[in-house]
Amino acid sequence: MQERHKNRKKYFNELAETCRKYFLPYIERWHIVEPATNVLEIGCGEGGNLLPFSELGCNVVGVDIASCRIKEAKSFFEDNGATGQFIAEDIFKLRDMERKFDIIICHDVFEHIDDKRHFLLNIKKYLSDNGIVFMSFPAWQMPFGGHQQICRSRVLSHLPFVHLLPCGLYKLLINAFGEDTGCMNELISIRNTRITIERFEMLSRFAELKINDRMLWLVNPHYEVKFGLKPYKMPQSLAHFPYIRDFFSTSCFYILSK
């Protein structure tokens, strides 16, 4: 398990840095970001992605079903002298927020969603008429698409592609490295809710969401602050090959609209 998974303030600061340097400029190519822009993050965690938007004067709202993360978000924003609204709830129960947001952020959340079709059908209800969704997720087949980096075992947390083993063999491996029940359940849950580039684009079309842009990364921008690795976009010559590209896409950026 990496230090950032235990030190949530460190994780908050790292997310804010990555957002400021990479997510925000990408979003600004598709929607103006200015004071009073309404920004929602679904699955906001500690709120690191929202800090750069708050610093620009945007009205930011973070929603997460984990109340402990919302508590941390409020605390970290207060520490930074930033303003934001944070709510511990299922976003789709907050009907008073429909048709309100200019920008919706969904970063590294979609791969955890069980009913993805329902999620995409409903997320657009929260967009303003000219609003956009910034969606990012790791392709399932990429080396660490199973989130094995959360494991306490230093060996297992650094083993690429092990999540692609047959489920029974994968469970045996997790047990062999002494991971606890909580870790096992989380890893198998991620396996069950996995997402590929091809399935995401199919579901987006089904939900009548327009894909305005796609950017696939060989080296995830967040790896810069995490590991000191320079981000590297996937060449278009590889990005056009269905299924093969999934094995190399450490992060997939999308801009969606109604």
Identify the function of each model-found stretch:
Residues L51, E72, D115-K116, F144-G146:
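Short glycine-/acidic-enriched loop or helix-start segments at secondary-structure transitions
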Residues L51-S54, L120-K124:
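A structural alpha-helix within SAM-dependent methyltransferase catalytic domains
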Residues I113-D114, L127-S128:
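Helix-to-beta-strand junctions that scaffold the AdoMet/dcAdoMet cofactor pocket
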Residues E98, K116-R117:
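Conserved strand-to-helix beginnings and helix N-cap segments that scaffold or border functional pockets
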Residues D108-H112:
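Short catalytic micro-motifs in class I SAM-dependent methyltransferases
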Residues R117-N122, I132-S257:
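S-adenosyl-L-methionine-dependent methyltransferase catalytic module, highlighting the catalytic core
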Residues M1-R99, I103, H107, F247-Y254:
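Conserved N-terminal segment of class I S-adenosyl-L-methionine
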